[in-house]
Amino acid sequence: MLHPQQMQEQQQQQQEAQAASIIPEHYEMEYIQRNNKTVSFCQIPISILGGAIAGVIGFSGVYGFLFYFFIYITFCSLFTLKENKNLHLYFPNPRSIWFDSIGAGLMPYILFWTFLYNIIHIY
């Protein structure tokens, strides 16, 4: 039979062991880079598709850029929901998905946005 204080200590040790198994203490740089590439490889086709949609619809000026931010926020939200809030297991800073790659998809977006806008609405 255990003393109540010993039982508390055992419970604390079990909780610490569970927390250690859930949250990694260190991250492998190779895996972090691979996870960032995966996010980037998903974001670029989404940006291309968003630029094509913006060009076909006929957005111009500020509305086109606002549409890009809408597409970007939608992608990040869906990616976060898909991972069921376990992003801390794959990224040291889960906010990096939201802020680090905001410019990565901007150039393909602008390319397809202006290309399809010019083809459909100008010519």
Curated annotation (Swiss-Prot):
Q: Report TM segments.
A: 42-57, 64-84, 103-119
Against Pfam families, the record matches this protein to: EMC6
| Topology class, membrane | Multi-pass membrane protein
Topological domains on the Lumenal side lie at 58-63, 120-123
Q: Name one GO biological process term.
A: protein insertion into ER membrane by stop-transfer membrane-anchor sequence
Q: Where in the cell is it found?
A: Endoplasmic reticulum membrane
The residue spans the entry assigns to the Cytoplasmic side of the membrane are as follows: 1-41, 85-102
Ranges in coiled-coil conformation: none
Keyword Transcription set for record: no
Q: Which GO terms describe its cellular component?
A: EMC complex; endoplasmic reticulum membrane
Superkingdom, taxonomy of origin? Eukaryota
The alphabetical list of record keywords is: Endoplasmic reticulum, Membrane, Transmembrane, Transmembrane helix
For this chain, the family text in UniProt reads:
Belongs to the EMC6 family.
Q: Quaternary structure per UniProt?
A: Component of the ER membrane protein complex (EMC).
The protein's job, in short, is: Part of the endoplasmic reticulum membrane protein complex (EMC) that enables the energy-independent insertion into endoplasmic reticulum membranes of newly synthesized membrane proteins. Preferentially accommodates proteins with transmembrane domains that are weakly hydrophobic or contain destabilizing features such as charged and aromatic residues. Involved in the cotranslational insertion of multi-pass membrane proteins in which stop-transfer membrane-anchor sequences become ER membrane spanning helices.
- What protein is this chain from? ER membrane protein complex subunit 6
Q: Which organism is it from?
A: Dictyostelium discoideum
**Encoding gene, per UniProt annotation:** emc6
